[in-house]
Amino acid sequence: MFIGQKKSQKINAAFLSENEKSKYSEKFSVWLRGNFFIPDARKFWVKPSVKYLSDYLKKNPVDIIVSSGPPHSMHLIAMQLKNKFNIPWIADFRDPWTNIDFYQDLMLSSFADKKHKRLELEVLKNANSVISVGKTMSEEFEKIIFDAKIKSENKNKFRVITNGFDSDDVSSEKIILDKKFSIAHIGTMAKSRNPKAFWKVLGELIQENKNFENDLEIKLVGKIDISILKNIEYFKLEKQLKKIDYLSHNEIVKVQQQSQILLLVLNNTHNAKSILTGKMFEYLSAQRPILCIGPKDGDAAQIIEETQSGVTIDFEDEAALKKNILIYYDLYKKNQLQTANTHIEKYSRKNLTKNLCEVMNEVVSSKK
């Protein structure tokens, strides 16, 4: 109750609705969530979970606790258990807390904002080690501790372990690529992830080049904000659009491997540099050229450059977009559109799990 939606629906401040205007009930739900469900809707798990796990730990001692969030309530559970039993604790962040892109959209009161930041600081201070999904996010967490003038005994407290891909998704068989010059985006495209310059450039190219118009196919798999569909319509790209609401994981893997280009659009928000979506690593496993639209000095751009898996272009750089799309199109026409994809194995989940085990062993050893 109190959410203005069906029980099966989730509230996402970054993507409220495909309707033109979000309903007042949805906006109220976001306000309610931000101001009363702190740090998140799982806050009511904390007390019973601490009680249950305390009973469990008394009978079954462990060497280390690892919490992963969001939801950040998981960190609050782990923090209480760490303090109660003096067990080393690693806090793993797959997304930021108060620096997440939609934080400003939660309509927080001053009290709620201060509480979020206080809890975040307590977690960062009390954890023996803090793992983040990317370099920029890790530096932001470290700055919070530095600004609070809190000294840490562990010089390597803040570590980076990215998301990754399943090695089983990397095909050893010969892939038959799409006959069309297909540009595929997999996943939700919220309003903040609308590449307006990209649609404009594609619209210009289909007007300038009849062959390009006939060859182009835009594949969007997942939920798409209405503003994006309107942009596509405005630039007369409806004939090239292939919109697919849902595919299974295996079907998505196939689409990624068969597409000529994989489109990665980062949210055009204040924290764009730190955004490292799990989707990017799945793109790496597909071994197709990645066209990333986002900051050229961001974490995603760094990995794309390191792995030679594609190109990153700033949000509004129409000239660079047109230049690189035409380069890819020329290679496509010559049947030479490939990518080097070097050093991608370091981002396999197997290797990343090995990195996590090393951090766990270090934390446990330092407490003995």
Regions found by a protein language model. Give the residues of each.
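Carbohydrate-associated surface elements
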Residues: 136, 161-164
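A conserved catalytic-core segment of Leloir-type glycosyltransferases
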Residues: 1-47
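Nucleotide-activated donor-binding/catalytic signature segment of Leloir-type glycosyltransferases, i.e.
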Residues: 209, 215-222, 227-253
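Membrane-proximal helix-turn-helix segments that form the acceptor-binding/catalytic region
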Residues: 73-76, 80-84, 98, 110-132
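A charged, aromatic-enriched C-terminal amphipathic alpha-helix characteristic of glycosyltransferases
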Residues: 316-320, 333-362
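A short, active-site helix/loop in glycosyltransferases that binds the activated sugar's phosphate group
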Residues: 117-157, 301
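Acidic donor-binding loop of glycosyltransferase active sites
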Residues: 128, 237-242, 256-274
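Conserved donor-binding/catalytic core segment of Leloir-type glycosyltransferases
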Residues: 176-193, 199-202, 352
